[in-house]
Structures are given as structure tokens and as C-alpha cells.
């Protein structure tokens, strides 16, 4: 996987070059998930990242295999910067279940959101039988729609 840039009619274009094909694909022909993956890679793989990176549903539009790759980039970036990640994805939660310091669940209350923190110690007890993604989809961690 490689990329190329091209200037055409005064505009800079990004093109993706994927093995075994040597034909560059312009960004406008790439899927939304691929474009989002490339944007996340640019953010998370910075050699000198900002002190805080916030990601809102980084899994959107991605195949579960790509979500695992995003989770690896998030885990690696967390060694260099603080990250706040909001997700509704059981795949992302499961892929990150060993790489968080604090987990929060948000539930709807009558006058606003109710925030509940969960520690690694609490999670270790649950982890004996379930993945973090399973706990999320079961409603055990909150975040319920109703």
C-alpha cells in the first residue's frame, strides 16, 4: 500500500497505489471506509502527536478487520498521547479491551446524560466470562437506547 499526490488544474489530489496493481486510484474512487481509515492513520501515526486526540466513532464505514487495525493504531498512539474515543462498536471495544485506563458509559437520564466510570478492576471480573464488546451489546455497561 502506497500513495501518490498529483497536481491537476491547480488542485492537489491523493491517489492510493495498492499491490499488486500499480495503477493509482484517485481518492474520489475510494470507499468512505478506506478514506476514513487513511485519515485515522494520518492522525494516529504522527511522530509528534498533539497532547490530546478525540475520536468520535472511528469504526464507521469499516470492515471488522480494518477496525482491528484501527484499534492497534489507537493502542500504539496511546503510548505517546492521551486519547478519548467514543464508540458504539462491539468490535472496537473488544479489540481495545486490554488497552484502556478508564472506561465510561453514558446513559440517558431525565435531565441529561448519566456518566458511569468503570475501572480495570471492575472489568477484570467481567472479563472472565465475556469480552468488552459482549458486555456492551448486552447492556451490562449501560449505553442503552431506552
Region spans (language model):
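Generic recognition of flexible, low-complexity loop/linker segments
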Residues: 1-3, 92-93
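Short, well-ordered helical secondary-structure segments
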Residues: 17, 22, 31, 40-42, ...
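Short strand-connecting beta-turns/loops that link adjacent beta-strands
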Residues: 8-9, 19-21, 49, 98-99, ...
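Loop/turn-to-beta-strand initiation segments
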Residues: 49-51, 63, 78-84
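Conserved ABC ATPase signature
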Residues: 2-45, 58-65
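C-terminal lobe/lid and adjacent interdomain/linker elements of RecA-like ASCE P-loop ATPase modules
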Residues: 69-146
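Substrate-recognition/cap regions that form aromatic- and gly/pro-loop-enriched pockets
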Residues: 50-52, 65-74
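Catalytic Walker B motif of ABC-type/P-loop ATPase nucleotide-binding domains
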Residues: 53-57
Amino acid at each position: 500500500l502506497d500513495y501518490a499526490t498529483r497536481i491537476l488544474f491547480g488542485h492537489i489530489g491523493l491517489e492510493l497505489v495498492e499491490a499488486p496493481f500499480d495503477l493509482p486510484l484517485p481518492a474520489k474512487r475510494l470507499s468512505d471506509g478506506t478514506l476514513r481509515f487513511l485519515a485515522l492513520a494520518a492522525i494516529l501515526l504522527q511522530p509528534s502527536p498533539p497532547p490530546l486526540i478525540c475520536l468520535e466513532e472511528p469504526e464507521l464505514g469499516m470492515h471488522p478487520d480494518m477496525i482491528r487495525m484501527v484499534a492497534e493504531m489507537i493502542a500504539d498512539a496511546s503510548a505517546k498521547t492521551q486519547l478519548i474515543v467514543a464508540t458504539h462498536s462491539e468490535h472496537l471495544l473488544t479489540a481495545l479491551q486490554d488497552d484502556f485506563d478508564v472506561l465510561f458509559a453514558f446513559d440517558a437520564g431525565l435531565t441529561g446524560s448519566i456518566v458511569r466510570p468503570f475501572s480495570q478492576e471492575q472489568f477484570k471480573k467481567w472479563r472472565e466470562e465475556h469480552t468488552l464488546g459482549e458486555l456492551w451489546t448486552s447492556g451490562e455497561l449501560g449505553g442503552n437506547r431506552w
